[in-house]
């Protein structure tokens, strides 16, 4: 989950991102992590499926210019990884998450056409100051988001957005 203050570009509250992330503790008991860059905050709770020791998130490329939070599984990551290694990319883990980073570095948004799996992720490109939020083609993994007062809030479930106070909890009378 995370938050981006795209309008005023003021720093994102660390307490806010921690509160958002804590709402997903039930989904990821194995690890948690955070990344902050100016007006961006990313938080992650991890359930270890692939690379039990090396998949800490948010995960960065070797230059720490790309950061990703990822939920799901990339089924064809060994094939995509082999292709990227053939193109000169060096991997530090055995995690499928890292394939997203180097795939984006190589192909940009075209990496989405190469990924087969069930996933949702948010990737922050520090140099371009761009956030790519994506999910699998079938929509197996969800991405929830809200934009309120110049801040984008997102998560793999609604709880982080509610914890951020970005949505009211009133019933729609219609």
Each model region followed by its residue ranges:
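Cysteine-centered catalytic environments shared across enzyme families
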Residues: 1-174
């Amino acid at each position: 989950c995370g938050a981006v203050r795209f309008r005023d570009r003021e720093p994102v509250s660390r307490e806010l991102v921690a509160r958002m992330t804590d709402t997903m503790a039930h989904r990821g008991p194995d690890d948690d992590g955070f990344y902050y860059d100016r007006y961006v905050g990313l938080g992650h709770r991890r359930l270890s499926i692939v690379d039990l020791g090396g998949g800490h998130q948010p995960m960065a490329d070797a230059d720490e210019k790309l950061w990703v939070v990822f939920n799901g599984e990339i089924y064809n990551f060994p094939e995509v990884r082999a292709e990227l290694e053939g193109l000169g990319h060096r991997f530090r883990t055995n995690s499928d998450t890292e394939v997203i980073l180097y795939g984006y570095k190589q192909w940009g948004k075209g990496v989405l056409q190469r990924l087969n799996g069930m996933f949702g992720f948010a990737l922050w490109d520090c140099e371009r100051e761009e956030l790519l939020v994506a999910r699998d083609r079938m929509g197996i993994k969800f991405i929830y988001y809200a934009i309120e007062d110049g801040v984008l809030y997102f998560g793999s479930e609604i709880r982080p957005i509610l914890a951020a106070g970005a949505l009211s909890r009133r019933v729609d009378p219609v």
